[in-house]
Amino acid sequence: MTNIFVSYNQNVQAEQSLALRLQTLGALYNLGISLPDRVGRAGLKETTKQRIDKADLFLVFATRNLTKPVVDEINYALTAKKKIIVVYDKDVKNNLNIKEVHEIEYDGKRDNPEKIIGEINKVISKSKEDDTVGAFVLVGLGLLLLAALTSKNK
């Protein structure tokens, strides 16, 4: 089973909802999805570090600039030598400048799913299990775009 750590910006409802949905959907894809432990005290908790250590992939969908907790989690994942993918909305400034972090920018109005999946496949290798991970990340992007469309129509 592939384990994925999904981080999100706190106080950004769309990102938090997406992370929770992905955690639920992960079971359908036979993926272990972990989220950060952000209950109680601030700072990077041991439980979050353990979840990152267990992960094969670190994933963030960013609709806003990355917050300090997310950047701290990314930095920890770097020290743990994890594959890291940050999927940015085109309107968000990429506030990381770390070559080991794979940043994918998307434009919900212009980009097609093949572009995003192609970028993801550059990061992950080519096994059947990795095809599942790529599909899972694409589902996450679809959910994020759907949430954006829904919020604009309100």
Question: Locations of the language-model features?
Answer:
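Conserved N-terminal substructure of TIR/SEFIR domains
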Residues: M1-L57, A147-K154
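A short helix->loop->beta-strand "cap" motif at the edges of active sites that frequently abuts
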Residues: A80-V92
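Short acidic, S/G/P-rich loop/turn micro-motifs used as interaction or catalytic elements
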Residues: N11-A14, V39-G40, R64-K68, V92-K93
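Short beta-strand/turn micro-motifs composed of small residues
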Residues: S7-Y8, A62, Y88-D89
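Conserved TIR/SEFIR loop-to-helix hotspot centered on a Trp-containing motif
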Residues: R64-K81
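Short, well-ordered beta-strand core segments
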Residues: F58-L59, I84
